[in-house]
From Swiss-Prot:
Domain of life: Eukaryota
GO cellular component: cytoplasm; nucleus; plasma membrane
Name of the gene encoding the protein in the UniProt record: MAGEA1
Gene Ontology biological-process entries: negative regulation of Notch signaling pathway; negative regulation of transcription by RNA polymerase II
Record key words, sorted: Cytoplasm, Nucleus, Phosphoprotein, Transcription, Transcription regulation, Tumor antigen
Name of the protein this chain belongs to: Melanoma-associated antigen 1
Biological role stated in the UniProt entry: May be involved in transcriptional regulation through interaction with SNW1 and recruiting histone deactelyase HDAC1. May inhibit notch intracellular domain (NICD) transactivation. May play a role in embryonal development and tumor transformation or aspects of tumor progression. Antigen recognized on a melanoma by autologous cytolytic T-lymphocytes.
Impact reported for residue 169 to A: Abolishes HLA-A1 binding
């Protein structure tokens, strides 16, 4: 049973738990490390112990599940004291535990913010601290920043400050697009991020992208033809039916192709709500923060910008 099907039978608090569970498959890894491409990772994937963030106390870290993989420590060389070996090992474990807790808090906050977006409600810093961050208030800037980045990259949702004095925020779709795919109660994951990715690909292909190239690029983020996706549902239906019916995409046979091949173009609604320039700027902006999942698109976007397109 998919996440969206499960949510139909859940109470609000149970839906949040189910959603946060699924968000373990969201790109938290991308938001936590600029050296990684944007892929769908799991909460069990813990950054290496080379991070400069200070470790938490053992009491604070022990609340996280113990399903964490640690790097095997090398055997001490002859003559080294047990104290010398114990120090780095303990530090490494505490660091890994701390980073794992932060990663889970990011996923939890993404789930909380998605519920706020679905309800079309603003959110305050105080709400986030009380409902999600709790004992990790000192880590709020990091957790909030990474959660905001994940929302933008995966779901196409921007977190915008509405009231600086009251630390109040609103959640809106990126690039001025009015589509999010939330057409019913069973649609719990916004699809704007998927739409933006496809629009970027088409723009980079000069306005029309072969279907096979679209699927090849989508496979980089583990979105495959015929395979249900935790965030986007059935991708072929979303790509060739839903977004076409919403007039964001055109899906047509390549003229004179035999055997028949198909391609995607921007639909009239996409052309009315955004522009090639905006999506190029989006690619450059995002890839300046993390290594973009389509490096070739970033390079093409930079070339287009230099040429004044």
């Amino acid at each position: 049973m998919s996440l969206e099907q499960r949510s139909l039978h859940c109470k609000p608090e149970e839906a949040l738990e189910a959603q946060q569970e699924a968000l373990g498959l969201v790109c938290v890894q991308a938001a936590t490390s600029s050296s990684s491409p944007l892929v769908l990772g799991t909460l069990e994937e813990v950054p290496t112990a080379g991070s400069t963030d200070p470790p938490q106390s053992p009491q604070g870290a022990s609340a996280f599940p113990t399903t964490i993989n640690f790097t095997r420590q090398r055997q001490p060389s002859e003559g080294s004291s047990s104290r010398e070996e114990e120090g780095p090992s303990t530090s490494c474990i505490l660091e890994s535990l701390f980073r794992a807790v932060i990663t889970k808090k990011v996923a939890d906050l993404v789930g909380f913010l998605l519920l706020k977006y679905r309800a079309r409600e603003p959110v305050t810093k105080a709400e986030m601290l009380e409902s999600v961050i709790k004992n990790y208030k000192h880590c709020f800037p990091e957790i909030f920043g990474k959660a905001s980045e994940s929302l933008q990259l995966v779901f196409g949702i921007d977190v915008k400050e509405a009231d600086p004095t009251g630390h109040s925020y609103v959640l809106v779709t990126c690039l001025g697009l009015s589509y999010d795919g939330l057409l019913g109660d069973n649609q719990i994951m916004p699809k704007t991020g998927f739409l933006i990715i496809v629009l970027v690909m088409i723009a980079m292909e000069g306005g029309h992208a072969p279907e096979e190239e679209i699927w090849e690029e989508l496979s980089v983020m583990e979105v495959y033809d015929g395979r249900e996706h935790s965030a986007y549902g059935e991708p072929r239906k979303l790509l060739t039916q839903d977004l076409v019916q919403e007039k964001y995409l055109e899906y047509r046979q390549v003229p004179d192709s035999d055997p028949a091949r198909y391609e995607f173009l921007w639909g009239p609604r996409a052309l009315a709500e955004t522009s090639y320039v905006k999506v190029l700027e989006y690619v450059i902006k995002v890839s300046a923060r993390v290594r973009f999942f389509f490096p070739s698109l970033r390079e093409a976007a930079l070339r287009e910008e230099e040429e004044g397109v």
